[in-house]
Amino acid sequence: AFSNVDLVYLACPPSPRKAYALLASAQGKAVFLEKPLGVDVAESRILVRELTAAGVPSAVNFTQAAGRALTNVSEKSKVGALGDLIGVDIIVTYPHWPRAWQQTADWLRFRDEGGMTREVISHFLFLSERILGPLELVWAEPEYPAQGDLCETHVAARLVNGAGLPVMIMGSVGGAQPDRQEVTIKGSKTSRRISEFVIDTMSSGGQFEPSSSDPTDTRATGLQAQLDDLVLLMNGKPNRLATIQEALRVQILIEGILSGQRAN
């Protein structure tokens, strides 16, 4: 069945992902995994080690990785266009979870594998690490429903990078409101806000206004950029996709948040 396959895309729930990925890599196939990398950190460490040893192309689908917004913000921050970096704010709110278009993916409502923290906030922690470098969790406060097998309804957390710059997270579910998904990269001169994954705006102290990034950068354009970089990965060329090592770091942070971990 694998004879004419070059790459296996794994969009299944997290738990079986490791077994499928290793089955594919054992036959020399490249693997493109959905996030999160997994829910068991020990198992994911094994997955990363064995995929690395197999030597097959591998990456994780954090959808902003190759998009114009993250690329532009990263470039601007490196050349000082934002001034001194101050930190990152992540805000995620929903009227219901799972969202209406996810209702058939029933596992997303359960604590074992689902929830907005793994499904959405993980994207923004990946973005934050691309800009600020590796993060450490300082404290986290998740809140779960009385029915203990259901996923979190609220979450707050603080993380810091090596220089002590903070990443603050606030997530909640409930109430009459539209979906809200935004990450704000704060600078002393200019701040950038990415909303709904692709809407890139900027502020120098006033209202956030459209940035100089291409206003036609829709989510479809961002996904096409992912596929373009996937071709680069398959051809052994430099690319912007999330590595399995980056995804493991994000998973460790996410699982720490969901367990209410605090720094010693």
Model-identified regions with their sequence ranges:
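Rossmann-fold dehydrogenase core element
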Residues: I46-Q64, D84-V88
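Hydrophobic residues in well-ordered beta-strands that form the structural core
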Residues: L33, S58-V60, I169, I194
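C-terminal helix-rich "cap/oligomerization" subdomain common to oxidoreductases
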Residues: L7-L10, G162, D229-N264
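Beta-loop-alpha module in the N-terminal Rossmann-like domain of NAD(P)-dependent dehydrogenases
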Residues: A1-E50
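Active-site loop of classical SDR/Rossmann-like NAD(P)-dependent oxidoreductases
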Residues: A176, D214-D228, A242
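Contiguous beta-strand/loop segments that form the cofactor/metal-binding neighborhood of enzyme cores
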Residues: E119, L125-V198, L227-K237, G256
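Predominantly a Rossmann-like dinucleotide-binding segment in NAD(P)-dependent oxidoreductases
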Residues: Q64-E141, P145-G148, N264
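A short helix->loop->beta-strand "cap" motif at the edges of active sites that frequently abuts
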Residues: Q27-K29, A54-V56, L165
